[in-house]
């Protein structure tokens, strides 16, 4: 028996089934990490005699009657933190058991990469175990290639937090911003039998030469990530002007309607994250969507069309406040078209007619809610009375941290600042503030400014500050300093 397998790649960061892209001769559609709530598409395919298998982890209102749904959120399976890739691994493991083979574990490195990228909770034993096993034996061509490329940033070892910062964002950027060809190169570089194939080089100055698919994929991802960062920063500048001009910070939820300016739909989630972190409140970043709605006469004849306006985009909850479920809040308002995804990272749509009503509703419902950030610290030290070795010991535990097992925050209080212990390094290019404590501990703040540096000077010669930060260690010529 010969199996004919087709696969398709979304043109952007869409989710779910797009019926027009499914060939007529297909008998089984497999939907990983999506489609639990594509009820109409399930029914349409079922009526054509096409079976649908959904392997997913997203929340849905009900279980589809027209598809086979494997979803840890819709049953009593205890590990709710397995993402789509984790659920696919569980499915493959069961297939191994049925067929008396052992293939699934060969892909544990990709399982780890996927679950880290999807920010799954490492407090669950099964999730932690799968990620640990996957990172212990990285054999996937692309994953290995990116580890080599990011070797300086990962010099302390391969950990969940290292992968989350230095590898996962490059995959994410390619999915959001890459061309179809660039995405295909990326996914094919993850295949054992294709990753190391020689293909025509696209590197500048190397026309006519060849390189492996992995080499090209890793370089592409870096270039795309740089493009994404530039596009994100440019959009942020425009959006922040809109926020100021329209006084949107007067509202409890920062809901931004992009009327004359449209943000790239593949960037709205990233931009919403940045806005949420800066303004410290839930964010809705919404593009204008205009649809033509037909108008019929009494005989059912179309006589004209009306413009239907809605606002659609990304929502982000503020994770440092007690407002811990933006999706639930939106649904309970009964004023949104949809709020789909995770509790605090989701897609949102609202009609133009309901928008002002929703703003008034949220302002009233959250009138007494304080979004002031609360930093829960694990240690409180005093500026002249702690051991630098404590900072080093915490820094050496970096392999443990990840989503749900957050890297410890440390507060240091009563730090005396004077001209002799503070300096602004690289003030013109990348201003970095450095404060040196009596015990040799260095306090470093990147992306500082001349203004911030000058605030640390006093006419009396000394000021006192408190800081909150994370622990790092510096190794130079074999000497370790906090």
Language model regions located:
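OB-fold single-stranded nucleic acid-binding module
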Residues: 346, 354-359, 384, 453-455, ...
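A structured phosphate/pyrophosphate-recognition subdomain
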Residues: 59, 63-249, 289-307, 334, ...
